């Protein structure tokens, strides 16, 4: 774990006693991968995940916001033995979205993060056998991966660059105006 902040644009905070804040900007996109997840407390699974993260960290900075329980499990499995792995405390929404926006790729098991990466055009790798957000798979912004595939998939996603495909239908940022028109029309008919 690094003792100095990575040189970046917007600060992403950490609390006292954790890794120093990270600075994240889109200029860092070629250098960072980030991950989220609710880690089961299974030492064998943790060891497999740590091995994959170490492979990624050989080429990229890996920034991981972790709940203390997940941090303890992964630390016991040797997570912090790799130089380019940086662990923060859980981040607030705005700070986390800044981290996502500046990442070259995201690894997650969160359905919400799968949607947010699609909208932000950040390649997403979902570390699960399925997703409740299949539109992110069919649109091409997200890919389901196993721990065995993780390192190669992250490096490929970083090499491929930002997601350039079409956003899913109605993901144009205009939900509010559409809802307002429907509600206004409904109220006018009452």
Predicted regions and their residues:
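Short beta-strand segments
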Residues: 63-65
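Nucleotide-activated sugar donor-binding and catalytic core shared by glycosyltransferases
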Residues: 1-59, 70-190
């Amino acid at each position: 774990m690094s003792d100095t902040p990575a040189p970046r644009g917007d600060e992403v905070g950490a609390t006292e006693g954790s890794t120093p804040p990270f600075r994240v900007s889109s200029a860092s996109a070629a250098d960072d991968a980030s991950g989220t997840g609710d880690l089961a407390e299974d030492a064998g699974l943790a060891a497999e995940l740590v091995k994959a993260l170490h492979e990624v960290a050989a080429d990229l900075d890996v920034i991981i916001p972790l709940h203390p329980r997940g941090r303890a499990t992964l630390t016991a499995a040797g997570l912090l033995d790799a130089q380019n792995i940086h662990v923060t405390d859980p981040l607030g929404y705005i700070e986390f979205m800044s981290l996502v926006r500046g990442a070259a790729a995201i690894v997650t098991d969160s359905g919400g993060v799968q949607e947010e990466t699609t909208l932000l055009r950040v390649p997403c790798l979902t570390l699960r056998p399925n997703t409740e957000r299949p539109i992110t798979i069919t649109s091409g912004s997200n890919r389901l991966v196993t721990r065995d595939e993780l390192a190669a998939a992250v490096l490929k996603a970083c090499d491929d660059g930002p997601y350039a495909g079409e956003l899913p239908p109605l993901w144009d940022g205009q939900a509010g105006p559409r809802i307002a028109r429907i509600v206004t029309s409904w109220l006018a008919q009452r």
